[in-house]
Amino acid sequence: MAPRVIGILRRFLPEYLKTRPSLTPAQWRAIRAITQCRTPALGGHRYACAPCQKETFAFHSCNHRACPQCGREATREWVERELAKRVHAPYFMVTFTLPAELRSAFFGPYAKAAYDIFFAAAAAALHDCLANPKWLGATTSGFTAILHTWNQQLLFHPHLHVIVPAAGINANDKVLCGKSNTFLVPVPALQAAFRRHFRSRLKALDWQVDPAVWRIDWGVNIQPFGSGAAAIKYLGAYVCRTAIGDGRIRALEGDSVTFAWKDRSHGNAPKILTLPGSEFIRRYLRHVLA
C-alpha cells in the first residue's frame, strides 16, 4: 500500500508527543478525525441493489479540512458556486505575503488577532486602491480572499490569495469595469496601503516589532487571470483541503518521511525532501488552525 498521512500519524505520533505533549484542541480534533477516517470507528453505510442483489459497504469519511482523504466533494461545490458568481470583467489574482519579521505574531495569544488583521489590512488596501479614480474609482468592490499558511516544504509561510474582478460601483451607483486585462492597480501603491493598514491595526496589540519592517517592501503580487475561472479552480484545490495530499508522499521508511515538492524559486522544479517523522508531523499540524 502506498504511504499516506494517516500511516505517518499512526507511526510517529507517539514519539512526537514525548517531546511535544501539548497540542491545541483543534490539532487533537484533526488527529482523531484523520486517524479514524474511513475506518470502523466512524461506522459506515451498506448499499444494496435490489435487481442484482449486489451489496457494497463503505466506511464514513471524517470530512475534516486537514484530512487528505476528504474534501473533494466540498471542493467541487465551492468551485461551482464561485464560478457562478463571476461578473463580466477582467480578473486578477492578488497575493499578499507578510515579511518574515512579522510571522511570530501568528503564534501564541496573538494568533487569532494577527489573522484578523492580515485579512482586514489586505481588504482595506484593495478597497483603497480600487476606489482611486486614477485606476478604477469603485467605492464599492468585492473579492474572495483565501489564506494559505504553508509553502511546498510545509514550512510556515502565511499568505493570502485574493481573486479580484476589476469591477465595482462608484459613489453615484454606476457600475464600473476595468478596461485593461493586464492592469489592476500599481503594485507599489497596493504594497504601501497594505503596510499602512497592517501597521495601524497592529498598534492595538501589545506586541513589539522591529521598526525596520515598516521600511522594507512588502510582498504583493498581481497576476491577470482572464475570466477568473482558472484562478478559482486553482485555489479550489486548497479551500477545503490541507497543506499536502497523500499523492505527494513518496516513502515512509524507518524514522523518515519522504515527499515531493516544487521549488517555486527555480521554475517549479520538482524536488524530493526527506524529514524525520516527528518533524513532518510538527510541520503538518502547524497548519491546523481550527
Mark where each language-model region is.
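Beta->alpha loop/short-helix hinge microenvironment recognizer with preference
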Residues: 1-290
